[in-house]
Amino acid sequence: NQGGSGKTMVGLLGGSSGLLEPLAENFNACGLECETSADIKRQIWTKLFTNTAASSLTAVLQVPLGFIHSDPSARRLMEELAKEATAVANADCGGFDAQKVVETVDTVCRNAPNGYTSIYADVKNGARSEVDTISGAVIEAASEYGIPVPYHEMVVKLIHALEHKNRT
């Protein structure tokens, strides 16, 4: 039981373009819910918050999303990861409220109590995960802005260790 599906968002980093509407219409015609976004960077950060704050923890702890909501220690870890990511996102494009981000991530965890993430599955199955693309992106952007992200750095190292352990 993976976490869930959602709508596909398409956009250009430089703003909107009339070229994207036909693309979204084609996705929708194929049964894939799709919308265009005039501010795709904010959409990317919004998606990244849940992936970096919750998905990475499901892999490290080897638990479903609901555990992050229900366990006080796991929830505190999620909050710290969400706050770090929010600080980086605000340096990048501004306008995110850390407490709202935490609440949104917690809602995702609460609403999918038995949901497992792709990072969890990759680690469990001994495959290389997408942690470098997700949490690694936060670390890279944090470095550009001079923002410390110790929770992200630790989670990435833990997942790499688990990947190695489960491949051997």
What are these regions (language model features)?
Residues 1-52, 57-98:
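Internal alpha-helical scaffold of NAD(P)-dependent oxidoreductase catalytic cores
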Residues 28-29, 79-168:
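NAD(P)-dependent Rossmann-like dehydrogenase/reductase catalytic/cofactor-binding core
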